UniProtKB/Swiss-Prot annotation:
Pathway: Amine and polyamine biosynthesis; putrescine biosynthesis via agmatine pathway; putrescine from agmatine: step 1/1. Keywords: Hydrolase, Manganese, Metal-binding, Polyamine biosynthesis, Putrescine biosynthesis, Spermidine biosynthesis. Its cofactor is Mn(2+). It comes from Edwardsiella ictaluri (strain 93-146). This is Agmatinase. InterPro entries: Agmatinase, Agmatinase-rel, Ureohydrolase, Ureohydrolase_dom_sf, Ureohydrolase_Mn_BS. It comes from the Bacteria. The gene is speB. NCBIfam families: agmatinase (TIGR01230), PRK02190.1 (NF002564). It is an enzyme of class 3 (hydrolase). Its EC number is 3.5.3.11. It catalyses: agmatine + H2O = urea + putrescine. GO terms for biological process: putrescine biosynthetic process from arginine, via agmatine; spermidine biosynthetic process.
């Protein structure tokens, strides 16, 4: 626990240096962590409201509300007893240099993966997933993508750095297999012939969680999986603090149940993106993101 004198701190507001007050390790490559948390304070690829650069800090700050619980409900065990997780802070890049951010993030992830670590990353806008996929594909080969979002982000018309184009480029670069990838919660215009399976928000809200999960697992098969969660997958009633909100989304409860249900998949990398705290109300968006990130760690710990 990252506190003065290594003393226990059950405060809901203090000592928010690392996510969940987990240990800080600014040189995590040679350590013995299972998962390494990295922030990417970048929002230069945003098409709507900016501010995602403040997302990692907001997620870490609100995570103090989650740090006190030992045997977390409904898991009935403490993730920290099964996984060694550290927070290495934020990727460093020159302000305004999107290419440097992309290069530095990819190199950082490649180095972590080469040393046997796994990556949980906080955005920042959703573009950050593309350099992460490049790093993971070098290590794991072509992957399946499980993608929670209001948008498919498969648009071909964007610029080089655009948070709506990553999943157009990723299949073309051979990073992911669309035939084994699924996009959950979509409720905006998209190309229907790009190979991805789209489970739109209306059907995800109307079908049972068990039914949706069964389809996801059937599509993914036994490929290694990269899990990415854009917080605008949630309805703005549950996550107003994001750059491109779209009504008609998932509840936080349904999203948590779906993430928990991915436990059996071979998830090799994860991220939570697009929290823009300037538009948040009572930190509910940041809290949703922090809780989803924690559940992602719990589905890994449950395998131990």
């Amino acid at each position: 626990m990252c506190t003065l004198g290594h003393k226990p701190d059950n405060s809901l507001v203090s000592n928010a240096f690392g996510f969940l007050r987990l240990p800080l390790d600014f040189m995590p490559y040679d350590g013995d962590a299972d998962w390494v948390i990295t922030g990417v304070p970048f929002d230069m690829a945003t098409s709507g409201r900016a501010g995602g650069r403040h997302g990692p800090a907001a997620i870490r700050q609100v995570s103090t509300n989650l740090a006190w619980e030992g045997k977390r409900w409904p898991w009935n065990f403490d993730m920290r007893d099964r996984l060694k997780v550290v927070d290495c802070g934020d990727v460093v890049f020159s302000f305004g240099d999107a290419q440097e951010m992309s290069d530095n993030l990819q190199a950082h992830a490649e180095r972590l993966l080469a040393s046997g670590k796994r990556c949980l990353t906080f955005g920042g806008d959703h573009f950050i997933t593309l350099p992460l996929l490049r790093a993971h594909a070098k290590h794991f080969g072509k992957m399946a993508l499980v993608h929670f979002d209001a948008h498919t982000d498969t648009y071909a018309h964007g610029s080089k750095f655009d948070h709506g184009t990553m999943f157009f480029h990723a299949p073309n670069e051979g990073l992911i297999d669309p035939q084994h990838s699924v996009q959950i919660g979509i409720r905006t215009e998209y190309d229907h012939d790009n190979g991805f399976t789209v489970l739109d928000a209306a059907q995800v809200n109307d079908r049972s969680v068990e039914d949706v999960l069964a389809e996801v697992k059937r599509i993914v098969g036994d490929l290694p999986v990269y899990l990415t969660f854009d917080i605008d997958c949630l309805d703005p009633a549950h996550a107003p603090g994001t750059g491109t909100p779209v009504i008609g989304g998932l509840t936080s409860d349904r999203a948590l149940k779906l993430v928990r249900g991915l436990q059996d998949l071979d998830i090799v990398g994860m991220d939570v993106v697009e929290v823009a705290p300037a538009y948040d109300q009572s930190e509910i968006t940041a809290l949703a993101a922090a809780t989803l990130a924690l559940e992602m760690l719990y589905i890994q710990a449950a395998k131990k």
